[in-house]
Amino acid sequence: MSYIEKIDPELFEAIKNEADRQEHKLNLIASENYASRAVMEAQGSIMTNKYAEGYSGKRYYGGCDFVDVAENLAIARAKELFGAKYVNVQPHSGSGANMAVYFSVLQPGDTILSMDLSHGGHLSHGSPVSFSGKLYNIVPYGVSKETEALDYDELLKLAKECKPRMIVCGASAYPRVIDFKRFREIADEVGAYLLADIAHIAGLVVAGVHPSPVPYADFVTTTTHKTLRGPRGGMIISKTEELAIGVNKAVFPGIQGGPLMHIIAAKAVAFKEAMSEEFRQDQDQTVKNAKVLCSCLKQKGFDIVSGGTDNHLMLVNLNNMNITGKDAEAALSKAGIIANKNTVPFETRSPFVTSGVRLGTPSCTTRGMKEKEMELVADYIEAAIKNSENDALLSEINIKVRDLCLKFPVYE
């Protein structure tokens, strides 16, 4: 870091302040986590200097011997982790991975059946403001009004009506187990491709604490950060060699040029870390922590979407607390708790205001927090949201949160 301090003190100050924020604030953003020092070292390595258009053994540049080693390691480890045959580790992001899958088998105007963003889906699954919503005919599905969970019978009915070319399952704010086998059956009924986007739950999947879509989906996409605790990036698993060939062409030269070899090296490191028993235990603890936090909030009168959680996150509908998601996020931030406002199923407010907050336990679990700490966190959340305009009290909670964080440092 001394090089940055010497050359660019302004940026150094921002990085230093961000490090302080990460250490002393409690992060409950479900899509964030803390990468290991080894992962960050790989990201900052000399691999960043190398252009490597193409694929291992078939590059458009010379001097790729060692970046080939890095990419081959990442691919082999991903195959082992996920029990997959065909893997592409070059996508720069999860959205890019989804784009490559779409481009590999779909034509503009084809119908995609995917989860509505306001019900827990993702922008890249067909939101009107995303490329996916502009290029394809999107038919959204959502959760049941009664259970706030997926209704697979209704989903089958909708699939038969719209006859999609592709069905997308996976979400960014869905707290329940996804039945990938049932999705496969529905896709087969209508002759559709099945894409499973497991960006949020990939770590849980490789640890065996959430069912895997790999045996069922034609394509599986994921980010490599979030629960996988790797660098920011994407990955695609294809079911057959034929599909994999199409995906590889869609990634390069379809939507990308040179791969980010320093990021691919960091992916290799993260995949090796994810093979450890410690990682498996952390993923198991992540779910345990989410269940305890969820249960404590329910006992305090909070309305939990779908009544609970099976994974690393929960959605809190704040309508019964007479506060918006935006205001709750602001109050929590003043209390030292970082979360994000989120739409809830059958939302009536703007996405910039929302009626809910999304809470996740990956980051606090990586710090070493367990069930006992989640009970404390629930107390802090309750106090902050129920006293959202009491700045003095929010400052007191902030001190308690800071003290808690100091007991569980991110980086020793």
From Swiss-Prot:
The keyword Cytoplasm applies. Coiled coil: none annotated. The record marks H225 as: Plays an important role in substrate specificity. Pathway: One-carbon metabolism; tetrahydrofolate interconversion; Amino-acid biosynthesis; glycine biosynthesis; glycine from L-serine: step 1/1. Keywords: Amino-acid biosynthesis, Cytoplasm, One-carbon metabolism, Pyridoxal phosphate, Transferase. Its cofactor is pyridoxal 5'-phosphate. SUPFAM superfamilies: PLP-dependent transferases. Its main location: cytoplasm. Gene3D superfamilies: Aspartate Aminotransferase, domain 1, Type I PLP-dependent aspartate aminotransferase-like (Major domain). The keyword Amino-acid biosynthesis applies. PROSITE patterns: SHMT (PS00096). GO terms for molecular function: glycine hydroxymethyltransferase activity; pyridoxal phosphate binding. It is found in: Cytoplasm. (6S)-5,6,7,8-tetrahydrofolate binds at L117, G121, H122, L123, E242, S350, P351, F352. Homodimer. This is Serine hydroxymethyltransferase. It comes from Methanosarcina mazei (strain ATCC BAA-159 / DSM 3647 / Goe1 / Go1 / JCM 11833 / OCM 88) (Methanosarcina frisia).
